[in-house]
Amino acid sequence: MMHGRAWLGVVLMLAALCACTRTTPEQRLRDTVASLQAAIQARDAGDIREVLAEDFVGPGGVDREGAVRMAQAMFLRHREIGVTMAGPLQVRMQPGHASVRFEAALTGGSGSILPDAARLYSVETGWRLDDGNWRLTSADWKPRL
């Protein structure tokens, strides 16, 4: 039979292990950015829509459905889509909100070794935490080259 101190030691050790595995809001946001990148590369408009907030606003006032249609048009134009982060994410966290800036190379092609199109963009995004999930509320991108 375990004594009180032994039980306390086991409980504290389990609590410490649980605390170590808890994901921080910033890490969850970084994971969401990575899942959006994967959705674009997988040409999955449904997964893209899932990340966008209902009140999403993009360049020129494009809304959530407009952004999804823009992605679908790109998918029709290019059989393969590549998104490569060209440097680290610059994350600024605030309670319930965040902004993420990064450089991204976007490529599109027909499946051959070399892409048919490639462009580098400066991207600035705004995020909101909704029911434990990060949702993209705004995005602006400008060509770099």
Write out the residue ranges for each language-model feature.
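Sec-dependent bacterial lipoprotein signal peptides
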Residues: M1-C18
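Short, low-complexity N-terminal intrinsically disordered segments enriched in polar/charged residues
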Residues: A19-V51, V68
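Short beta-strand edge/turn micro-motifs at domain boundaries
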Residues: R22, S99, A117-L145
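A short gly/proline-enriched turn/hairpin at secondary-structure junctions
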Residues: V51-R64
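Residues that flank catalytic or metal-binding motifs in active/ligand-binding sites
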Residues: L52, G87, V123
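Solvent-exposed loop/turn segments at secondary-structure junctions
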Residues: D55-V57, L106-T107, P143-R144
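Surface-exposed, charged secondary-structure patches
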Residues: Q72-A117
